[in-house]
Amino acid sequence: MLTYAQAGVDDEKTVRALKNIIGLARETFKFRRGKPGEPAENLGHYSALLDFGNFYLAMTTDGVGTKVLVAEAVGKFNTIGIDMIAMNVNDLLCVGAEPIALVDYLAVREPDEKIFAEIAKGLYAGAEKAGIAIVGGETAVMPDLINGFDLAGTAIGIVEKGKVITGEEMRPDDAVIGISSSGIHSNGLTLARKLLIPKYGLDYEYEGRKLWEWLLEPTRIYVRAVLELLERVEVHGLAHITGGGLINLKRLTNYGFSLEMPPIEGIFKLIHENGVPLEEMFRVFNMGVGFVAIVPPEEKEEALGILNKYYESFELGRVTKEPGIRVENYGIKL
């Protein structure tokens, strides 16, 4: 089991299966045409944008995926809420929106007061980091359907017209800046779990931490860093590096990227040492870079100064005229 597809997650198959849903969903845009909340047809690669006159309401939905299985296995539920909020608010940032509110969806086999209390702690911590309000939610108790629990949410943000980040402003030689991740975040857990847990067990010590600690490290929330960046620097593109790894950059532009990625360390090193090919690593995991900002070359130093106040950030490379993503220091083209 050396690829995500072999672990049971076939992204290409998912894209093919979604075509009918996406096509019919776009057909529903006409139901709001000429009314408040009309969807913006060609804007929004990470989040939908709804037109409210002088501003757009950005909207997105996401969950935690199989990271919840690790939480269940070790009985640690107080950070999983941070992950769910991070997955949503970081996506809102990518269109230039300020996250403002979220509703959560918790599906369980049976309610457990102690577990709910721990999940709530993570939701509160995530909301505080993101500066958002949790304004509602749904708890579904479904013993015939759910074995364990699932946690997801839908978040909204706002962005003024004229300030939407689409990637259209990107040009060759723009600087590509990476903001470091905290680890695996909330993507690639299916492959990591199925590869590592049967071989080592969750209590396996690796570089001073147990395997479950590596896997449950909360996803970083980049709201404060990116909002300050947007206030002070001209930004041409933003990308949350989630499922698909660096392939997420292709959402922004038809231009290409020439990158020098950080050394492979921590949980990524362990996964790679257990047989996952390098190209697959960069297609599945964030590889130490949780968020990317693309800025004009002359703005690079100021951008790095801002972002490094929050998390370690570094110049990854540049935008190129030639399409494709090249990881130069590992000899990989995606």
Curated annotation (Swiss-Prot):
GO cellular component: cytosol
A biological-process GO annotation: adenine biosynthetic process
Annotated GO MF terms: ATP binding; phosphoribosylamine-glycine ligase activity; phosphoribosylformylglycinamidine cyclo-ligase activity
Protein's UniProt keywords contain Ligase: yes
CDD domains, A to Z: PurM
Family: Belongs to the AIR synthase family.
Name the UniProt record assigns to this protein: Phosphoribosylformylglycinamidine cyclo-ligase
